[in-house]
């Protein structure tokens, strides 16, 4: 139904799982929705555990890092684990990019050129884990001056990232710019 499509479009398929009965769905639609919500929850924990492991290594190596989108957005949800996430988006200051790239490779993550759909990030894959996008920059502004300004603001904020609890996982979230 339209409700399910909208929940998926907004990356919150699991959000109303505890209130599904009140949506007056058919038993078949209810069962399908609950199955999708359960799958989302399982994927969420798998991603967060992989991210947690990588972030611990970045911390130990002294590499300033922040999570973009995904868990950083989920930190603002009443039920963070209801947010759908497909990959892990990380950003480091430009002078730490090569160090971060090498660290991911040492941890067994393979640089995957096919994941590099644009020059914004390097893509990494590892068996049984979600993909990682290590961002070189974030802005997609076509105005170069605006893009540079936004990216500089993000780079300057990374060392001040606030390690925030997201459903039991510690996530470096950019402070207000």
Give residue spans per PLM region.
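Conserved NTP-donor binding/palm subdomain of two-metal-ion nucleotidyltransferases/polymerases, i.e.
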Residues: 1-86, 92-177
């Amino acid at each position: 139904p339209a409700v399910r499509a909208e929940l998926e479009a907004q990356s919150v398929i699991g959000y109303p799982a505890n209130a599904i009965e009140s949506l007056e769905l058919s038993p078949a639609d209810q069962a399908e929705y609950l199955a999708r919500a359960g799958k989302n929850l399982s994927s969420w924990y798998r991603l967060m555990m992989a991210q947690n492991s990588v972030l611990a290594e970045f911390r130990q190596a002294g590499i300033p890092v922040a999570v973009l989108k995904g868990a950083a957005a989920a930190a603002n949800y009443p039920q963070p684990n209801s947010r759908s996430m497909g990959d892990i988006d990380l950003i480091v200051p430009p002078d730490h990019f090569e160090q971060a790239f090498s660290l991911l490779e040492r941890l067994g993550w393979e640089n995957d050129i096919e994941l590099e759909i644009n020059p914004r990030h390097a893509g990494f894959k590892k068996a049984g884990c979600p993909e990682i996008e290590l961002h070189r920059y974030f802005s997609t502004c076509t105005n170069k001056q605006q893009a540079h300004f936004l990216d500089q603001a993000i780079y300057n904020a990374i060392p001040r990232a606030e390690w925030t609890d997201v459903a039991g996982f510690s996530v470096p979230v950019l402070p207000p710019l």
